[in-house]
Amino acid sequence: MNLCSSGATASTTSLSSTGQAERSGGVPGGGAEGGGGGGGSGNSGGGGKTSDVSAEASTLCFAGGSGTAGAITGTDELSNANSPANGAGGASGSTGSAQQPTGSNGHSHLHNENNANMPPETRPKMVTVKHPESNKPKPTTKKSKPIQADQDVIKALQRCRDEGIKRLDLSKSSITVIPSTVKECVHLTELYLYSNKIGQLPPEIGCLVSLRNLALNENSLTSLPESLQNCSQLKVLDLRHNKLAEIPSVIYRLRSLTTLYLRFNRITAVADDLRQLVNLTMLSLRENKIRELGSAIGALVNLTTLDVSHNHLEHLPEDIGNCVNLSALDLQHNELLDIPDSIGNLKSLVRLGMRYNRLSSVPATLKNCKSMDEFNVEGNGITQLPDGMLASLSGLTTITLSRNQFASYPTGGPAQFTNVYSINLEHNRIDKIPYGIFSRAKGLTKLNMKENMLTALPLDIGTWVNMVELNLATNALQKLPDDIMNLQNLEILILSNNMLKKIPNTIGNLRRLRILDLEENRIEVLPHEIGLLHELQRLILQTNQITMLPRSIGHLGNLTHLSVSENNLQFLPEEIGSLESLENLYINQNPGLEKLPFELALCQNLKYLNIDKCPLSTIPPEIQAGGPSLVLQWLKMHSPYRQIDCYYQYELQTVNQAPGAGGNGGGGAAAAGGSASRSSDRR
């Protein structure tokens, strides 16, 4: 029996208001990931623009149920560069009504006229809605319950058949079944069914021989019908986020495919028949359970993007070297023990993801991949790189070697960092930064050496003049060299968890510094020059041995976060009241801190104040428990400045009540001005 024969003609009742939407200026959506049509009339979502029932390209966008149809768009989390543009749909209310009165469920005005002949008890209730753009009341029917999605699909398919629509979007519509009448939509070139509840496709899907794009992502598919092989023009097939335990065999017979998404399924193996898909340029097998990638991958010589990340691969076949057009190869989050030497054949490679595997080395042939701009092997067990490899990759701008077993910098000298602006060597076993290693790295702005074994910094640190972010946390540094003053472009300096006892006075030269983190060191005194860091926003000093803050701290007008908890503070300077931008203040666990300065109440932007485990004898416990606002209010109420203000208020009242006194307005302004002036002087 021919599944694609027309058979009996189905009912041609169409969604009239949606049809009107297409004839009244809908804008067609575009792209393989799908979007809705333009704004339609009434409350029903508009489809793409058509010219009545013509042979031109047309679109039907369906949003499921009655009521206003929202925009329907598709997303591609894998590769925006390889995904077609998304369309967009819309809906309008009163605009469509002005052109042709419609009901909220898409029926024409003729149906509303028929309601007049209905018995009163069955007649739809009429309500009046006043639209903001018009004072004239407009009648509309009370919204009924949404029509079953599967019933609306039948109507949409009928219209698709009758109008020769080429692009049909039924996404996000709670569809469970695609009816067999889909076979009649022979003009379709794009069909979007993503984000539904479809468990299987009907065999009649194979009748859509003109289909080029088929989006089935985010459903519950476990298989595909064999008849799909009749769709011999299919180029884009999206099966992401389904329940496929294997790649359906029919896919291997779709030799016209150029883009195949199989991400986030339950696939455990890839058959040798994969070699038949010679036209593939993009293949995503990300987030499955694949343990082996066979030699068939080498037959896909047109591949430009291959994503097999987040699987269980232990090895790659040597045949991967045949995919000479690859520009992006993502292998991260697998269990790879090695990379084949043939990787060096991929001279077009720009991005190679090897993060979080079990690699102990990388092949020297990687130096042939000179188009790479990023080298990232984070989260492996690598102890050293092949000699001169990084220097050969002269286009590198970012190098990430963090979370490995490096005991020293890669061999290759200063030449390997010539064009690099970011280096990350966090969490290794490196005990020194070689002198002059960054002498050619004129563009280096970011260096992360956190969690290593550094005991000192190189004598030429003063030459790192373009450095913007320097992270030296969790090492064993005992001293910060005076030459740090030359890093005048520095904005972020992180020195937490070291063994520093003092900070050099030259720190004041870092006028662009926004973040200074000195947590968990052995610092007893801060230099007065800290007050020169006028751009500073975060100052973290917790867990040190600081007994007092310098009065110059009051000059840090941009400071929003100050943490001095777990120190030996005896008092806070009055100048802390000048920190008008301060939002968070941590002074908890200072066992000698018994009182707070009244000037703290001048920090009007303070949102968080932690005074836990401070023996504040002057502030009642119930006030302390009430949070920063209550503490600040208490400080205001008990401030000596308040007594001065009260005196002036009393004086003002006396003057205003005196016989022949001037108007209240003038006296009030003068007194308030005087009080404000004194307040300003205090600040």
From Swiss-Prot:
The keyword Nucleus does not apply. Residues 1-54, 74-150, 661-683 are annotated as: Disordered. LRR repeats lie at residues 164-185, 187-208, 210-231, 233-254, 256-277, 279-300, 302-323, 325-346, 348-370, 371-392, 395-416, 419-440, 443-464, 466-487, 489-510, 512-533, 535-556, 558-579, 581-603, 605-626. Belongs to the SHOC2 family. Acts as a Ras effector and participates in MAPK pathway activation. Probably acts as a regulatory subunit of protein phosphatase that specifically dephosphorylates Raf kinase and stimulate Raf activity at specialized signaling complexes upon Ras activation. PANTHER family: LEUCINE-RICH REPEAT AND IQ DOMAIN-CONTAINING PROTEIN 4, LEUCINE-RICH REPEAT-CONTAINING. This is Leucine-rich repeat protein soc-2 homolog. It comes from Drosophila sechellia (Fruit fly).
